[in-house]
A protein has these predicted regions:
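Thiol-/selenol-based redox modules, centered on thioredoxin-like
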Residues: 105-134
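Active-site acidic short loop of glycosyltransferases
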Residues: 16-17, 48, 97
Length: 134
């Protein structure tokens, strides 16, 4: 749980002391899918850094989600999740998640530091992550 965003529960032991970058996406979202190659590149660029990349799909169709994961090469990432109860969940309401793609950044203390972080294809994301990794 985070103090700044108590409705999102991050696995504390697994992510303790790490930056956490969350990508909300869906199989039917063309901009989300177009950003996936950049997301994979960003993940590889920071593979030895103290950061966790989490992908949360708001798909309602499980099979479409699985196919998109396979097509985009996310099926090997253990931090890839299918959201439940979208859009009725309190989490989505609190985040005002009215559109995707949407990116969140939590610092190493579990505090939400960017509710609308730059996307993986945005040139600003690397400098932002580097700033928090120092």
């Amino acid at each position: 749980m985070t103090r700044a965003c108590p409705w999102i529960h991050l696995p504390e032991k697994q992510n303790q002391g790490k930056l956490v970058y969350i990508d909300f996406w869906a199989s039917w979202c063309d901009p989300c899918r177009a950003a996936m190659p950049s997301a994979k590149k960003l993940c590889k660029e920071y593979i030895n850094e103290n950061i966790v990349f989490i992908y949360i799909s708001i798909d309602k169709d499980y099979n479409q989600w699985v196919k998109a994961m396979e097509d985009d090469g996310l099926n090997t990432n253990s931090n890839n999740f299918l959201a439940l109860n979208y859009p009725g969940s309190k989490m989505y309401e609190k985040l005002k998640l009215s559109g995707i793609p949407r990116y969140l950044l939590y610092d190493e203390n579990g505090e939400l530091v960017h509710q609308n972080a730059p996307g993986p294809s945005d040139g600003q994301i690397s400098s932002l992550l580097d700033e928090y990794l120092q």
